[in-house]
Swiss-Prot record:
InterPro entries, A to Z: Trm112-like
Organism lineage string: Bacteria, Pseudomonadati, Pseudomonadota, Betaproteobacteria, Burkholderiales
Species whose genome carries this gene: Burkholderia cenocepacia (strain HI2424)
One of the record's GO cellular component terms: cytosol
PANTHER family on file: PROTEIN PREY, MITOCHONDRIAL, ZGC:162634
HAMAP family on file: UPF0434
Protein name (record): UPF0434 protein Bcen2424_2546
Family: Belongs to the UPF0434 family.
Length: 64
């Protein structure tokens, strides 16, 4: 994931910062508890494609 892109990309819902999870290949919004997938190096910033996360629980690379 390009560091410059990470500096400017925000959550499409709350416009807050996203955190890159390299192992899961996801961008995480802690405020909304959503994880946006990265497919072929491209962030998929569609709410319908995001999955719910649970704070304090490791992100599952399989997306469950």
């Amino acid at each position: 994931m390009d560091a410059r892109l990470l500096e400017i990309i925000v959550c499409p819902i709350c416009k807050g910062p996203l955190h890159y999870d390299r192992a899961a290949q996801e961008l995480i919004c802690n405020a909304d508890k959503l994880a946006y997938p990265i497919r072929d190096g491209i962030p998929v910033m569609l709410v319908d494609e995001a999955r719910q996360t649970v704070e304090g629980t490791p992100v599952d690379p399989a997306g469950r």
